[in-house]
Amino acid sequence: EPQLCAFLWRKRWLGRWVKQLFIIREHVLLCFRCAKDLQPLLRLELRGCRVAYRAKPGKEVQHELKVTAAAGAALVIGFTSRQHAEDWRKVWRCRS
């Protein structure tokens, strides 16, 4: 059973944003292209990850969380509000 689930913005190559389904289960972040997908596009172990909030006023997506894995890979996720980003950051901190 997921602890948190939502369609969020994911920053892709060349700064383009795509909306994808993110689910946190236990200590793993899963990213799916759509709700019908059975296999995740991305599976990120949250243990050992660092999470940082960044505000980007005047941009298309104004609230971002940058998740950096222990291996060094980074994932940038966009939110519609600061509160929404903070809610996700709290869950990530509990799971990491």
Could you describe each region identified by the protein language model?
Residues 1-44, 88:
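Polybasic phosphoinositide-binding surfaces of eukaryotic membrane-targeting domains
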Residues 29, 45-56:
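Phosphoinositide-dependent membrane-docking surfaces
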